[in-house]
Amino acid sequence: AMRMFRAKFRASVAALIFNEQGQVLLFKHTYRKFEWGIPAGGLEYGEQPDKAILREFFEETGMQIEIERLLLAESSKEDRNISIVYLCRIVSGSFQESNEISEMKYFDVNDLPRMLFAEKDLIRWAADNL
């Protein structure tokens, strides 16, 4: 029988979006020490991860994206986080800043701004494996 485990996990979803030149799309966050980062967010209770990333991206930019495929799903013991990363593409809309996101920009994978190491690693891993 399956044992229920009560450990609380947080789940986060992220979108990796590359343009024709192989540059990666980053958001400039208004509330972070490292301002630049990949588009990401949390799940609402009972929400499916694929719906969550579409909702988050739309809420933060006013733009519609679609999922091309799941790139990664992994859990981390350290911070009890389950990360689900999708390869996505922009379908429609034009960028409107929100209170969380002030700017959106494509960067060369080898010339990324100051950002979290884990996100840099993820971007480089994805770029090498696409």
Positions of predicted regions on the chain:
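Active-site-adjacent beta-strand/loop module that shapes the phosphate/pyrophosphate-binding cleft
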Residues: 74-95, 105, 126-130
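A short coil-to-beta-strand element that immediately follows conserved catalytic motifs
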Residues: 63-72
